[in-house]
Swiss-Prot record:
Listed name of the protein: Peptide chain release factor 2
Gene it is expressed from: prfB
Coiled coil: none
Keyword Amino-acid biosynthesis: no
UniProt keyword annotation of Cytoplasm present: yes
């Protein structure tokens, strides 16, 4: 790469950053950061821990955007200074190092822009992720356990905390259903890309004849709404609350007391379970919070569906809405049907490397908004 080409690239990066700045409203974000940090010095700040944590999360999110922008602009300034130095006094090792920095910088801008894509009203929230098998008994239940591990690994690799809220093991192997609470900034923003039906094609380890089987599992993802975000009144006459013994994937308190809670909301048929806490009271509180989140999400989806009908759009629903195929046999390939993103690195994906699929989905969503 010639120095003249490096100069052109750096000028393009600077122009790109100028365009980004035009849409960021940095001054307003910096003012908000200052206001949040003043709130955090108040002696009564932690009186309401939920509200306090919400302010901290919002402040951290703003600082990440603002600091990220300045880090990128400083990097361009540093690379430009190095290029000017090379122009005056050439050094081959320094030039090679600069070339690497320039080439890597494009990826840094891409990652920063991806962060900016998560600007939906609930993208910053924690996420509630549920997995359920399709028809097929043990084969589909085993597929759920594989997806469960994939999401757990993805969360570990990306700094999200995972809590197993509800877990029902399969009769022979696998999982009949599992609900995860995934905590971390933008957890919903990223994981909403996984909502839909996941299809597996492989030689079944449960088939003595070694035949190829196709299995399905559904993944549902909704935001974990804070109580102050939603206004949902639940009529006590509309719900039934049952207690049962926890049946989790392990743990000292499993099957000792009937601390687990199941709430059935009869008007909608929504059922939520919680067995994550040791006490029945805490499980009930958590289950009610999850029910409110589901009812609120249902309300939002109904409004979205009404708007889609007005616009003449039709969305796939149910088991027909396959978003991704995982083919292990007769060849190795994982393909996302929404974006055409694909890879032959099956083991890596099943070990949690689903970032490229999520990024491709978010970029497609951004492109559709720009049209």
């Amino acid at each position: 790469m010639e120095l003249s080409e490096i100069k052109r690239n750096l000028e393009e990066y600077q122009n790109h950053l100028n365009q980004i700045r035009g849409s960021l409203d940095l001054e307003n974000k910096e003012t908000n950061i200052q206001e949040y940090e003043e709130m955090m010095t108040d002696p009564d700040f932690w009186n309401d821990q939920t509200k306090a944590q919400d302010i901290i999360d919002k402040n951290n999110a703003l600082k990440s955007i603002v600091n990220g922008y300045y880090q990128l602009t400083n990097a361009v300034d540093d690379m430009s200074a190095t290029r000017e130095l090379l122009q005056e006094e050439y050094d081959e090792d320094m030039k090679i190092e600069l070339e690497e920095e320039v080439q890597q910088f494009e990826e840094q801008i891409d990652q920063y822009e991806l962060q900016l894509l998560l600007d939906g009203p609930h993208d910053a929230n924690n996420a509630i992720l549920e997995l359920h098998p399709g028809a097929g008994g043990t084969e589909s239940q085993d597929w759920v356990s594989m997806l469960l591990r994939m999401y757990q690994r993805y969360c570990e690799q990306n700094g999200f905390k995972v809590e197993t809220v509800d877990y029902l093991p399969g009769d022979e192997a696998g999982v009949k259903s599992v609900t995860l609470l995934i905590k971390g900034h933008n957890a919903y923003g990223y994981l909403k890309a996984e909502k839909g039906v996941h299809r597996l094609v492989r030689i079944s380890p449960f088939d003595s004849s070694g035949r190829r089987h196709t299995s399905f599992a559904s993944c549902d993802v909704i935001p974990d709404f804070n109580n102050d975000e939603i206004e949902i009144e639940i009529n006590p006459d509309d719900i039934t609350v049952d207690t049962f013994r926890a049946s989790g994937a392990g743990g000292q308190h499993i099957n000792k007391t009937e601390s687990a809670i199941r709430i059935t909301h009869h008007p909608t048929g929504i059922v939520v379970n919680n067995q994550n806490e040791r006490s029945q009271i805490k499980n009930r509180e958590a289950a009610m919070k999850m029910l409110k989140s589901k009812l609120y999400q249902l309300k939002l989806e109904e409004q979205e569906q009404e708007m889609a009908e007005i616009r003449g759009e039709q969305k796939d629903i149910g088991w027909g809405s396959q978003i991704r195929s995982y083919v292990f046999h007769p060849y190795s390939m994982i393909k996302d049907h929404r974006t055409n993103e694909e890879t032959g690195k099956v083991d890596a994906v099943m070990d949690g490397e689903i970032g490229p699929f999520i990024e491709a989905y978010l970029r497609k969503e951004m492109d559709s908004r720009d049209v």
